[in-house]
């Protein structure tokens, strides 16, 4: 495996690991409970980490497999970027989110209201969890996903 490709894979793996480690530390040590969307924003990092580990074991001379892995890196980064933008838009009230995540009431009777309350997550997706009273975790995720997307697109473009 060439050195640049190896570093590229390790950057993806390290970024995924560090971001997941950070959110779990925030969740379990600083009691910053994630909303439903925050939990789903972690999925691309799991996938990128798994792809990086798989890529470590693929011979870099297998061009088709390496290309497929690179495209999967880009697709996963792009999905994570779009989902993070969607979440930030909900937090900043640019648009409304799903009713089960934003606390909107759609119940018409007492039984439906009771069922909705029992199924509503405690943490609302439309309320930003701010770090240092400045930037939300979802906004930081947009930055992280943007950087990973740029890295993955650059590596594919340069055919490394």
Please annotate each region the language model reported.
Residues 22-27, 79-94, 111:
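C-terminal TM-helix exit segments that contain a strictly Trp-centered aromatic cap at the helix terminus
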């Amino acid at each position: 495996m060439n050195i640049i490709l190896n570093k590229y894979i390790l950057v993806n793996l390290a970024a995924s690991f560090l971001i997941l480690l950070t959110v779990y530390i925030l969740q379990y040590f600083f009691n910053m409970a994630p909303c439903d969307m925050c939990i789903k924003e972690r999925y691309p990092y799991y996938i990128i980490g798994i792809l990086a580990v798989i890529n470590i074991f693929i011979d870099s001379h297998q061009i088709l497999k390496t290309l497929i892995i690179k495209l999967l890196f880009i697709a996963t980064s792009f999905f994570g970027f779009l989902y993070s933008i969607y979440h930030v838009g909900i937090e900043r009230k640019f648009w409304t989110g799903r009713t089960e995540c934003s606390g909107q009431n759609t119940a018409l009777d007492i039984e439906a209201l009771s069922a909705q309350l029992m199924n509503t997550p405690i943490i609302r997706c439309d309320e930003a969890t701010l770090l240092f009273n400045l930037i939300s975790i979802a906004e930081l995720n947009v930055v992280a996903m943007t950087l990973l997307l740029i890295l993955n697109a650059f590596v594919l473009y340069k055919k490394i």
